C-alpha cells in the first residue's frame, strides 16, 4: 500500500499545476506585449463581489424573512425613485439654491455697503489732511525738506 501512496504522490506532482492565465494582454504599437496577471487580493475581491451579488431567493424564505425582504426592497426602491425625481423636479422648478440663500446674500450685500461707507469716510478724512498747496513741491536737496523751519542762527550753537 505504501507503494500505491508513493505512486499517487508522484502522479500529483507530475500533473501540471493550475496554469495562471493573464488577466489582460496589452499589445503595444512597437510590437511589445505585456501580460497582466491578477493578484491574490483581486481574486479575493472578485470572490467577495460574487458572494454579495448573489441575491437571496425569496421563494426559499419563510414568511417572516420573506416579508422583511420585500419590505426592504420596496423601501429602498421607493427612496431611490423619490431621490431621483426630487432632484429632477428641483432643477425643473429652479429650486437649486439653498432655502435661505437670499437672506445670506442680502446680509453680505448690506455688510459690503457698510464697509464701503466706512472706507469712504476714512478716505475723505485722509484727503482733508493733505497739504492744500500740492502744486508747490519741495526738492529733495533743499535744507527745509522735512524739517521745521527755524532761524539758521538759532539752530547753530555757538
From Swiss-Prot:
Membership in a protein family: Belongs to the FAM177 family.
Biased composition (Acidic residues): 36-48
InterPro entries: FAM177
Top-level division of the source organism's lineage: Eukaryota
Annotated stretches, region: Disordered: 36-59
The encoding gene: FAM177B
High-level lineage: Eukaryota, Metazoa, Chordata, Craniata, Vertebrata
Official protein name in the record: Protein FAM177B
Amino acid at each position: 500500500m505504501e507503494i500505491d501512496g508513493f505512486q499517487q504522490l508522484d502522479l500529483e506532482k507530475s500533473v501540471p499545476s493550475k496554469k495562471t492565465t493573464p488577466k489582460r494582454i496589452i499589445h503595444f504599437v512597437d510590437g511589445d506585449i505585456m501580460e497582466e496577471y491578477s493578484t491574490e487580493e483581486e481574486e479575493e475581491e472578485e470572490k467577495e463581489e460574487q458572494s454579495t451579488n448573489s441575491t437571496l431567493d425569496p421563494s426559499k424564505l419563510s414568511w417572516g424573512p420573506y416579508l422583511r425582504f420585500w419590505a426592504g426592497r420596496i423601501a429602498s426602491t421607493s427612496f431611490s425613485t423619490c431621490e431621483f425625481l426630487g432632484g429632477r423636479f428641483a432643477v425643473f422648478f429652479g429650486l437649486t439654491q439653498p432655502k435661505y440663500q437670499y437672506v445670506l446674500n442680502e446680509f453680505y450685500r448690506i455688510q459690503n455697503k457698510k464697509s464701503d461707507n466706512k472706507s469712504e469716510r476714512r478716505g475723505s478724512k485722509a484727503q482733508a489732511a493733505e497739504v492744500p498747496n500740492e502744486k508747490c513741491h519741495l526738492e529733495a536737496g533743499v535744507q527745509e525738506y522735512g524739517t521745521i523751519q527755524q532761524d539758521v542762527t538759532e539752530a547753530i550753537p555757538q
